[in-house]
Amino acid sequence: MEKIQIFGARVHNLKNIDVEIPRNSLTVITGLSGSGKSSLAFDTIFAEGQRRYIETFSAYARNFLGGMERPDVDKITGLSPVISIEQKTTNKNPRSTVGTTTEIYDYMRLLFARAGKAYSYATGEPMVKYTEEKVIEMIQSDYAGKKILILAPLVKSRKGHYRELFESMRRKGYLHVRIDGEVQELTPGMKVDRYKNHDIEVVIDRLAVKSPLALSSPSSPDDRLKKSVQIAMKQGEGLIMIMDHETGAVKHFSRRLMCPTTGISYGDPAPNTFSFNSPQGACPRCKGLGYINEIDLDKVIPNRKHSIHDGGIVPLGKYKNQMIFWQISSILAGYECDIKTPINEIPEEALNEILYGTLEPVRIDKELVHTSSDYFVDYDGVIKYLRSVMDDDDSTPTSRRGPSLGSEKWAEQFLAECQCPECQGQRLNREALSYKIWDKNIAELANMDLDELREWLNEVEKHLDKQQQQIAAEILKELRTRLDFLLDVGLNYLSLNRQSASLSGGESQRIRLATQIGSQLVNVLYILDEPSIGLHQRDNERLIHSLKELRDLGNTVIVVEHDRDMMLSADYIVDIGPRAGRKGGEVVFQGTPTELLKTDTLTARYLNGSVRCDSVAAKKTTTDQHLVLTGCRGNNLKGITAEFPLGKLIVVTGVSGSGKSTLINETLYPILSKHFYRSLQAPLPYDSIEGLKYIDKVVNVDQSPIGRTPRSNPATYTGVFSDIRSLFVNLPEAQIRGYKPGRFSFNVKGGRCETCGGNGYKTIEMNFLPNIQVPCEECHGKRYNRETLEVRFKGKSIADVLDMTINQACEFFENVPDILRKIKTIQDVGLGYIKLGQPSTTLSGGESQRIKLAAELSKKDTGNTFYILDEPTTGLHFEDIRILMEVLRRLVDRGNTVLVIEHNLDVIRQADHIIDMGPEGGRGGGTILSTGTPEEVANSDKGYTPRYLKEELERQ
């Protein structure tokens, strides 16, 4: 069958549509936000493919997999096995990294286990190992004619009294042991200091080594020497020590890898030796995380202008008549201060005593505690008190403890992640880090940018010996292949050690895409959700090449996408529209890109240039007010100074990984958030910031959900639901019945339907079949009880209002200004098609972001707000971008500053000011290449953005 055919698709807003998609093609499904693209691609095609796959399992297995409802579609034919690659960052496990997700790190572990060279972590010398025969040969050579002691190591630098060990050795017939370098006779009941570290060896034999000439055959060893070495090897579990009787000098030998100087030995390396998720390889201090949690003094004392009396030390709170405040008062009295002195005026020495405790007991003045005489109390310090809460240290005597500071969870607010001091953030123990290939250990390779790692893999074979080359050849080939797939999808700036939780949705999706290309599957249907998210135009070309490569393997690739280049490179396009929500859900075009350009659909008009995403003209005025951030050096930033002109639309551009998010989301925003709201999020390192006096608040409008449960919706988020409930409560019928605003909430008892708890549906457990949700038989999905629904405004109940689209609600409330003002802003950001009570869990990231923008637009404006948006065009059609730009321009026209991180050229060319970063991603980025108007940046000769921007400006 040459086509995938969908007949009668009616999922969500799809209007009984029929669609044909050619097999073994790259097909783009496009259309306005909310038009039904995802409903067709994911909720129809993917859902049906998944359902058919799961139906092949037994009922017992299906119970564990969860249910897959049949999508509302008449028939789908020609469907292959389906794999969905969505843009969700689902893995929040700190142990998951780019390396573990792609399995590249697994191959790296195998490479080091098979071809790594071991070095001593103590001396840096190459580790050695010996056979019994080699040990005997070296003894005969080095100690010929000398008296020696043959020792078997039993304990290496460990505490304990070892009474049982000594008794066991005595029962085996041994007469002497060597304890901490001193040979002693084994005696009954012998033991050592249990609180000190000890080195213990048992003396296996004392003998004079015969010269090879004195033996009957120079090539055959002395029988006694041979037997003693064998016993020592067995007793010492592969380790043996030879001590010169005359000088006391000791040499170490081992069947295992061993440092010839110190005797430190390693077990044979295995892949788990290099795994930070295994006890064998993980750093013992941080357990393989690379960081530990330490108390952050900036969180304990966030504002040093406050006094201790007024709560300057946050864990203590404001002054209370308690022992700890008496102790602190006593300490401060010795420095001629008191607890009402601002903390920044307290001498450093006094503050250290308050935080970390005193060496001597603190004298408590009798007048403070109303006793007949002064008395002395031990004082451990605020930090010790906090640690006792976190460690739940029940061994700490009650009299020595601080005040009741709450639970461990409460204490966690004063913690900050910091690099593990033992492994320096490398996650592995010192043994694993001591294996090297071409002077690099596995952690150093995992921290390289992927393109740097690829260069290393290209060159490493020249630096291996013949045996290593033979062992490593296949592993290196697999590593290069998998790495190339990641580079092809524009992820060259990442490292294998990058945590999965820190990746954007687009990065996670492209990693999964690279993994799928690497799997070399054929006859599969892949469905991707906007893979171009977060990609610069330069990287986008490589992504398109990768998708075509996936197609050329013999697969069908369906991409939900708005990117111009992606659409024009596709084999086939399905355009869903004509508008969004109830006005969408139809196929307005299906065919080739060439055929699309000849039509008059909204998408075609934008593609052929007859319509553009222009908002009103950019501001040409100059401003004296700037926010200046200097010395930014977090992640890959190279001590840069960034200048942000206020009252303008600023766009930060640059290739993926160039440092945009580091500069804005991890440096600038935390600084502003800490300044205005005392946020505890610490910014990355910087020197100074100037110009804060010109702004009065910061708002980060991101794409995170507006709520985590179906009970949250646009009405509750924007606050308009409170106004609607107030309207209903003031209606005559509600007044007669004595209803309060809570009566019209589906979250509290009173007005909601108690049968379903205000959900509108009930979940039915099906035992060995998937659970199903059915409309509540009492309220029929309306969420409220009958009495509440009897109160009506213009013939509509509260449930009817929540079921209206934003467009319908604007007409309905046209004479209620307070409600209309808030709803109108949602309509203004292009979301007229969503329902007022639509569950937040069903909204896309782009829709959530625009609802947040609408909420900001509805607020009273000071004109000095600093807005930050990270890739707001995600999930947006050209028409949606036009509407978004009008909204952003409105904010700027009020005097606010809007800063956008963006790759979309339709946004970049409309900026008042551009900051272009690069030139490359990762270590090759971190600098500001050019700044200015779009025309000024387009004329720059630095980086990649100017070339693409110039082409875009010439197209106008």
Language-model segments: residues:
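Conserved phosphate-binding elements of NTP-dependent enzyme cores
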Residues: 1-956
